[in-house]
């Protein structure tokens, strides 16, 4: 598991696992969505519901939203590299259907990670002492929402000790945010 990971970046000994990487690409041409949906077997298009073709591939297991403008959103990848690989595969599928698609402006838009600190957390005192960063309304949502400023990451913290981190453009932001919150969480450990 930790073979090629620099553990000096993870003093807590916990490495958040990437759950979803969202990227965008510009295929650089306009697309006939109906045409794509009819020809590609892994595609669905329901313009009354959503103005994009929804296409899926198995490897890497991802979903793409392909818009008539040639813009594409790729979601579901578990790493930045998988996101790029998948986006290239979708571009190739569109090319094979006869469109002059190029692969331009690839950009990671969001990375979501999660981990488990393996101890329960006292939510109310955490929310109170860090109220400038927190919103916690357990009757609406069971998680505490912690908006970190540096790096600019949103964390969902659950009483169980599970933590979800979102809003990163690169994985190091996920790691940094977790290493910053970890000592805070240990202070609010349920005894």
From Swiss-Prot:
Belongs to the TBP family. One of its GO terms (cellular component) is nucleus. The keyword Transcription applies. General transcription factor that functions at the core of the DNA-binding multiprotein factor TFIID. Binding of TFIID to the TATA box is the initial transcriptional step of the pre-initiation complex (PIC), playing a role in the activation of eukaryotic genes transcribed by RNA polymerase II. Sequence repeats lie at residues 18-94, 108-185. SUPFAM superfamilies: TATA-box binding protein-like. Pfam families: TBP (PF00352). GO terms for molecular function: DNA binding. One of its GO terms (biological process) is DNA-templated transcription initiation. It comes from the Eukaryota. Gene3D superfamilies: TATA-Binding Protein. This is TATA-box-binding protein. The keyword Transcription applies. It comes from Acetabularia peniculus (Green alga). Belongs to the TFIID complex together with the TBP-associated factors (TAFs). Binds DNA as monomer. Coiled coil: none annotated. It is found in: Nucleus. Keywords: DNA-binding, Nucleus, Repeat, Transcription.
């Amino acid at each position: 598991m930790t073979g090629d990971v620099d553990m000096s970046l993870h003093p807590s000994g916990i490495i958040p696992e990437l759950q979803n990487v969202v990227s965008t690409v510009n295929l650089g041409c306009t697309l006939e969505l109906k045409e794509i949906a009819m020809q590609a077997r892994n595609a669905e298009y329901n313009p009354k519901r959503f103005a994009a073709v929804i296409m899926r591939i198995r490897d890497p297991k991802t979903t793409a939203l392909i818009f008539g403008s040639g813009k594409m959103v790729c979601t579901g990848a578990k790493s930045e590299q998988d996101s790029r690989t998948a986006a290239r595969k979708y571009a190739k599928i569109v090319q094979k259907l006869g469109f002059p698609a190029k692969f331009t402006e690839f950009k990671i838009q969001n990375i979501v990670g999660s981990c488990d600190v393996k101890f329960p957390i006292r939510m109310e005192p955490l929310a109170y002492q860090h109220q400038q960063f927190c919103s916690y309304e357990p009757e609406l949502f069971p998680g505490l929402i912690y908006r970190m400023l540096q790096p600019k990451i949103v964390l969902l913290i659950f009483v169980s000790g599970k933590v979800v981190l979102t809003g990163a453009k690169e994985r190091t932001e996920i790691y940094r945010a977790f290493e910053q919150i970890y000592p805070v969480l240990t202070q609010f450990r349920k005894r």
